[in-house]
Amino acid sequence: AIDPVTKKPEPLLTFKRGALVHFAVSQYEVHMTTRLEGKDTFFLPFNRGTSEGAAGNDVPEDINQYATDYLWNEVLLPDNLLNVLARFIHLQIEEKEDWEGRKYKKETLIFPRYHQWDVVNKLVTAARTEGPGHKYLIQHSAGSGKSNSIAWSAHQLSSIHTVEGNKLFDSVIVVTDRTV
């Protein structure tokens, strides 16, 4: 966004310089983006899903609650937000080639969607509580960011330590049918 007075980009809205994520919130749904590009901005859903397994959020029975209150009552709590900044957010840099063969770098700031953040936190909490020797299954639909959920899970599981300071896991083995 260009400041109409100074004709300069607004720092808070500038990629990699300002806000790390932008949320669009209604009383029913949340969407997010890490890069504002005017009419070309691409928002991803940041919803919990419904109890029936559908997209969106359940509408609360209490008329004094919002279907999106998990955003401020859960995700944006200081400890949770710091956890996202420390363990999830990632600048992905890809080498690309244009149609004339010129190479360029494409930068994408990766911020977890709600279901990714939620499943990784649940998995890490279960592993901390239950310890080694258990099997876990992360199941996401097509195009929902399984690779990122797997990477965040493996990274966080490999860095869990006991109260004595020893690593909880000697290794983290990921079985997948994907080629990375």
Language model region names:
Residues 1-176, 180:
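ATP-dependent helicase/translocase motor core
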